[in-house]
Design a protein with these regions (language model features):
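Bacterial N-terminal signal peptides
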Residues: 6-14
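Flexible, surface-exposed loop/linker segments and immediately adjacent secondary-structure boundaries
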Residues: 20-149
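N-terminal secretory signal peptides that target proteins for export/translocation
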Residues: 1-2
C-alpha cells in the first residue's frame, strides 16, 4: 500500500513536466487551417476553435483559410492570412515564430511580457518589444516587415 501511494505521489509531482507546454490557443478559425504537431511529418490535424498550441507545433493555412492565435501569458495576437506556414518555438527567454511563407499580422503587447518576441524567416530575423507589425514572406523567399508607428 505504501509503495503504491509513493508511486502515485511521484507520478503526480512529475506529470506536468511530462506534458508539452501549451503556449497559445486558436481563437479564430476559418477555412483550411491545419496543425503539424511536434514529431509529426505532415499537417494532418484539422484545426478547431480553442485548440491548444504546444511548443514545437506548426500551422498551415490554405488558400481559403484564416486564423488567429492568442498567447496565454501576455495576450499577444497573431492573425494568420491565407497561404501561410509557420512554427512555434519557445525557450525560457525567447518566443520565436518561424515563418516559412505567408503573412502574419502581429499585435505584440509590451505589458506582461517575460520573453522577447522574434519572427524568423528564411533570410531574416526581427525582434520586437511591443508593437503592431506585419511579417510577409513570398513563396520565392522575399520577406518584408511593416511596422505601425
Amino acid at each position: 500500500m505504501t509503495r503504491s501511494l509513493s508511486f502515485i505521489i511521484t507520478l503526480l509531482l512529475f506529470l506536468p513536466q511530462l506534458q508539452a507546454d501549451v503556449v497559445a490557443r486558436l481563437v479564430k478559425v476559418e477555412g483550411n487551417v491545419y496543425f503539424k504537431r511536434m514529431g509529426m511529418e505532415t499537417f494532418s490535424e484539422k484545426a478547431k476553435l480553442g485548440a491548444a498550441i504546444l511548443n514545437g507545433d506548426a500551422i498551415k493555412v490554405g488558400e481559403t483559410g484564416f486564423g488567429a492565435i492568442m498567447y496565454l501569458d501576455d495576450k499577444t495576437i497573431l492573425k494568420i492570412r491565407e497561404n501561410t506556414k509557420f512554427g512555434f518555438m519557445e525557450t525560457q527567454n525567447t518566443r520565436t515564430v518561424d515563418l516559412t511563407h505567408g503573412t502574419l499580422l502581429n499585435t505584440v503587447n509590451s505589458e506582461g511580457r517575460t520573453k522577447s518576441f522574434r519572427i524568423q524567416t528564411p533570410v531574416s530575423v526581427a525582434s520586437v518589444k511591443g508593437t503592431q507589425f506585419a511579417a510577409i514572406v513570398s513563396q520565392t523567399g522575399v520577406d518584408q516587415f511593416i511596422g505601425k508607428e
